[in-house]
From Swiss-Prot:
Protein family according to the UniProt entry: Belongs to the CinA family.
Classification via HAMAP family: CinA_B
Residues annotated as signal peptide: none
Organism ancestry: Bacteria, Thermotogati, Thermotogota, Thermotogae, Thermotogales
Organism: Thermotoga petrophila (strain ATCC BAA-488 / DSM 13995 / JCM 10881 / RKU-1)
Family matches, as InterPro entries: CinA, CinA-like_C, CinA_C, CinA_KH, Competence-induced_CinA, MoaB/Mog-like_dom_sf, MoaB/Mog_dom
Domain of life per record: Bacteria
Protein name, entry field: CinA-like protein
């Protein structure tokens, strides 16, 4: 198996000012491409330190990836360090400089004087296009080894690395499928599938669970066993397909928006304890404007009454966190927006406000098109966890409703 190493560059990483998300992403991706990552190091913005690390690791690995230090400032030293170790010159690429300037002009009225540094290319390097930012990457081949320079911001690095994956894939590459579920507990899912998952030794099985993505069943094997894994997935879906919301990188909100488009339905949401979180998830999806009418954050009882038409009598008898309240919230929202489907959420996120009858974590979610589908939940966790789980469960219920489930 080929070996790889990663050098993440930036004093801000050493000082703990930002998380090293690039290392996590690259380690996962390189494993899937058939590399064994033998070292991940973090180096500050220092020419000697970067150079020494590059020199040392080039003796040990087949692939070396450096992230960060490709900006225009004097402390962006990655290009200089790699050129120094390889004893190659840095040359200004005028064509590249013009492209960088054109990109900057779209967002800024003035072009920084030091921008030329981003157009310095190591002799013999292939320039890698950055579709998001202004700092291009570079790729070099050195005695059969590959050296790749990528920018530090993950939103720039990820698409640039993804564009290289086909070129970097090795004979030891892995094939992986991730199946995502939300409303089924991890233990229940595993029990349903144990005869399929654990009666073989060809596919590596891992389950992970959190309050954002739910339960993820990760299935991994070597590329030569792709057909075996695909057949295994079919058997799994025969048993659990109704619970599945996504595969691999699919997000719940993306699935819901796609279903709304397919069914030509519009959506509006009324939120209390989630404070706009559900609306935010929906509008994060490109093209959501085709189906999303809008949202109302009615945190106080006054707004619930005056904007959504919740009756004073309902609030007095049942409280804001109740089946009756969320149903009146969706009814009022439908009158207000005219959306086909309305969803409302009201709950107690804590840490205070709970009672014996309605402890912290009590949440009501209502879906209303022609009739009400109302669910009560008792979530656990801190305030942010309860709010996140509430928004995600609203999406899960909506997904099931749009798929035509009798129950959500």
């Amino acid at each position: 198996m080929k070996k790889a190493a990663i050098i993440t560059i930036g004093s801000e990483l050493l000082e703990g000012l930002i998380l090293n998300k690039n290392a996590q992403f690259l380690c996962q991706e390189l494993k899937n491409l058939g590399y064994r990552v033998v070292k991940v190091s973090t180096v500050g913005d220092d020419l000697i330190s970067i150079s020494e690390e590059v020199k040392t690791l080039l003796l040990k690995v087949d692939l070396l990836i450096l992230t960060g230090g490709l900006g225009p400032t004097q402390d962006d030293l990655t290009r200089d360090a790699v050129a120094k170790v390889l004893n190659r010159s840095l040359k200004l690429n005028e064509e590249l400089l013009s492209k960088i300037k054109e990109k900057i002009k779209k967002y800024h009225s003035e072009i920084p004087q030091n921008i030329e540094r981003q157009a310095l290319v190591i002799d013999g390097a292939e320039v890698l296009d950055n579709p998001v930012g202004s700092a291009p990457g570079q790729l070099l081949t050195v005695d059969g080894k590959i050296v790749i320079l990528l920018p530090g911001p993950p939103r720039e690095l990820i698409p640039m690395f993804n564009a290289l994956k086909d070129r970097l894939r090795t004979p030891d590459a892995l094939y992986q499928v991730v199946l995502k579920y939300y409303s089924i507990p991890e233990a229940v899912l595993e029990d349903l599938l144990k005869d399929i998952l654990y009666s073989q030794n060809i596919v590596e099985v891992a389950t992970m669970a959190d309050h954002v993505e739910g339960v993820r069943l990760r299935l991994t094997t070597h590329m030569k066993n792709k057909e075996y894994l695909d057949e295994m997935v079919k058997k799994i879906l025969d048993k659990t397909g109704e619970h599945l919301y996504g595969v691999n990188d699919e997000k719940m909100e993306e699935v819901v928006v796609r279903l709304l488009k397919d069914r030509k339905k519009t959506l509006a949401v009324a939120e209390s304890c989630t404070g706009g979180m559900l609306s935010s998830l929906v509008v994060n999806v490109p093209g959501a404007s085709e189906v999303f009418a809008g949202g109302v954050v009615a945190y106080s009882n006054d707004l619930k009454k005056h904007i959504l038409g919740v009756r004073e009598d309902t609030l007095r008898k049942h409280g804001a966190v109740s089946k009756e309240c969320v149903q009146e919230m969706t009814e009022g929202l439908k009158k207000l927006t005219g959306a086909d489907i309305c969803v409302s959420i009201s709950g107690i996120a804590g840490p205070s406000g709970g009672t014996p009858e309605k402890p912290v974590g009590t949440v009501f979610i209502d879906i209303f098109e022609h009739e009400h589908i109302t669910m009560r939940y008792n979530f656990t966790g801190d305030r942010n966890t309860i709010r996140t789980r509430s928004a995600m469960m609203a999406l899960e219920n909506l997904r099931k409703y749009l798929k035509g489930r009798e129950k959500v």
